Amino acid sequence: MQKLKVFLSDSLNPHLNLATEEWIFHNLDPSQQVLFLWRNEETVVIGRNQNPWSECNLAKMKDEKVHLARRTTGGGAVFHDLQNTNFTFLSPKESYKRENNVQIIFDALKTFGIQGEASGRNDLLIPFPDGPRKFSGSAYREKKDRAFHHGTLLLNTDLTRLGNYLTPNPKKLQAKGKESVRARVANLTEVSPGINHDQIVTTMVKSFENFYAGKAEVESLTMESLKLIPELKEQYEQLSSWEWLYGNTLEFSHKMDEYLTLGFFDFHFKVEDGQIKDLKIYTDCLYPQVIEDLTESLRGKAYRGDAVREALMSVRGKHTELNLGLSEVEEWLCKNIEI
């Protein structure tokens, strides 16, 4: 009989929960079957190879204090909040079958009268009169002796907000990569009103034990206990760093324009790995040297607010008589970059 292990996270910190996944994947005994259940505060989670500027409405996220997190697995951008339960399965590679995990989820949902169906490799659907709608998406990862499968279960997420955070301003961005396809989604409460995270956790653990015909060792993980694990602390620091969240981005272009005190400004940035690789400023500003200094000071800088402020500070130092107008340019740029 295989050993069964269940981890339940009491933390709502997205970077810590994703770091816990990494710790489970790299450090636990791969011969056991593991289930990790967790949820996050309001967070947009993007895939390993996605562009946050292209996938997310960063301005709205900043205003409403929504976290950004990046997975180590592929797939598209998703929105997490406390009405969204996340699952992670770890299995020995030789016995791993995605269908097993899907069956565990479906068996748990039957408790609430919900009949799910699988679609393709990643999505789980529930039928509606106007067609099936997605309530879960997932991603996968493996190495020589273990396989990893994680995903989301939409319980009662505010789907309007989800659309807002995952809808970029199309006027501002032209990314080289393909943007995520927004599938039609549904909450499980639309089929089973009143379903909540604690109920899902209870039924998922029971379904996990029933499927493998055993009793699982259940362990609750808190923020305090997780921080005591050195490997986990290292993973947390990496997954919450600017370099991981924003620097791990392929080349893309970002255009912004506005009428300001010093004239009309039309900035074209070329960004790669979170750095300003090149830029061009089109403007009717009457101070050409200021434009040259702006261009040179911004080129090569990190594409984030503090780096832009540092660059503009040096330009303002050279052109003190234009300090007010340059401060306006600075605030406008930082608002558009929004990190």
From Swiss-Prot:
The protein's role, per its UniProt record: Catalyzes both the ATP-dependent activation of exogenously supplied lipoate to lipoyl-AMP and the transfer of the activated lipoyl onto the lipoyl domains of lipoate-dependent enzymes.
Lineage: Bacteria, Pseudomonadati, Bdellovibrionota, Bdellovibrionia, Bdellovibrionales
The BPL/LPL catalytic domain, residue ranges: 29-216
Gene Ontology CC terms: cytoplasm
Biological process terms in GO annotation: protein modification process
PANTHER family linked to this entry: LIPOATE-PROTEIN LIGASE (PTHR12561), LIPOYLTRANSFERASE 1, MITOCHONDRIAL (PTHR12561:SF3)
UniProt-listed Pfam families: Lip_prot_lig_C, LplA-B_cat
Chain positions recorded as ATP binding sites: 71, 76-79, 134
Record has Zinc-finger as a keyword: no
Biochemical pathway: Protein modification; protein lipoylation via exogenous pathway; protein N(6)-(lipoyl)lysine from lipoate: step 1/2; Protein modification; protein lipoylation via exogenous pathway; protein N(6)-(lipoyl)lysine from lipoate: step 2/2
Extra information: In the transfer reaction, the free carboxyl group of lipoic acid is attached via an amide linkage to the epsilon-amino group of a specific lysine residue of lipoyl domains of lipoate-dependent enzymes.
Keywords, ordered alphabetically: ATP-binding, Cytoplasm, Ligase, Nucleotide-binding
PROSITE patterns: BPL_LPL_CATALYTIC
Subcellular location: Cytoplasm
Ligand binding ((R)-lipoate): 134
NCBIfam families in UniProt: lipoyltrans
Region forming the signal peptide: none
EC number annotated for this UniProt entry: 6.3.1.20
Top enzyme class: ligase
Family the UniProt entry places it in: Belongs to the LplA family.
Catalytic activity line of the entry: L-lysyl-[lipoyl-carrier protein] + (R)-lipoate + ATP = N(6)-[(R)-lipoyl]-L-lysyl-[lipoyl-carrier protein] + AMP + diphosphate + H(+)
This protein's name: Lipoate-protein ligase A
GO terms assigned for molecular function: ATP binding; lipoate-protein ligase activity; lipoyltransferase activity
Quaternary organization: Monomer.
Keyword Ligase: yes
